Amino acid sequence: MPDVRDIQEICGRLDRGEIDRDLFFEQLTRAVSDLIGCPRAGVWLFVATAEGRALRCVARYDRRVDRIVGATDMLNAAAGPYFETLVADGCVVASDARYHPATSVFRDNYLEPLDLHSVLDVCFSVNGVPFGTFSCEQAGAPLVWSQRQIQMLRQIGSRASLALLNAANAHTDTQPAALWEPSSPNRLLTMPAPLDPEEDDAHRGTT
């Protein structure tokens, strides 16, 4: 039975050098998928890009193909309502994501092509500063997200935040991770170098 303590064990493996950054993200997203009970789970980091603020996917596991799949940056300019809700509430809870005000922008290019119906994204912080999000997605039919699932994602973020910071900075091609200042949540401080997107051609945030 999946347990949130599995997250601590995965973080410990990274801290002890038993797994590298890529394997850490794979194991973490697989564990999140199991714990939340959804087929897709990912980790996104706040970054600054030439087009403005964005979220960058560092790993996303899809149980339907049993592997990590890629994604392009999710840009605030293209997904304003989503970012506004995420910043204001610390989460986006969209059981009917195709018609939810924060996520309907993703319907044509992302949700419908991938048969996704529900989205649950929860922010996590490092030292009190928003650093990224955990994203869970339900396929096949809508899912009403429970308070237990929302709280579970928050617990995962709390337990994994420092390991996520270390993993984000461990890659030789990655600069210090992007943080939103608590006093000015719209301003980004630094920018990780881009990660190459993989096979997922349909994506959020580019239209």
Predicted stretch roles:
Residues R30, V43-M74, A78:
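GAF sensory/regulatory domain recognition
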Residues R13-G17, E26-L35, W44-F46, E84-T85, ...:
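Amphipathic alpha-helical regulatory segments at dimerization interfaces
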Residues H117-S125:
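A short, aliphatic-rich beta-strand micro-motif
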Residues M1-Q27, D34, R148, N166-G205:
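Signal-transmission linkers at sensory-effector interfaces
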Residues F124-F134:
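Short hydrophobic/glycine-rich mini-motifs in sensory/regulatory modules
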Residues T133-L143:
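Short beta-strand-to-loop transition segments that serve as allosteric relay/switch motifs
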Residues V126, V144-L165:
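Amphipathic alpha-helical "output/dimerization" segments
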Residues V65-E112, H117:
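Regulatory sensory and allosteric helical modules in signal-transduction proteins
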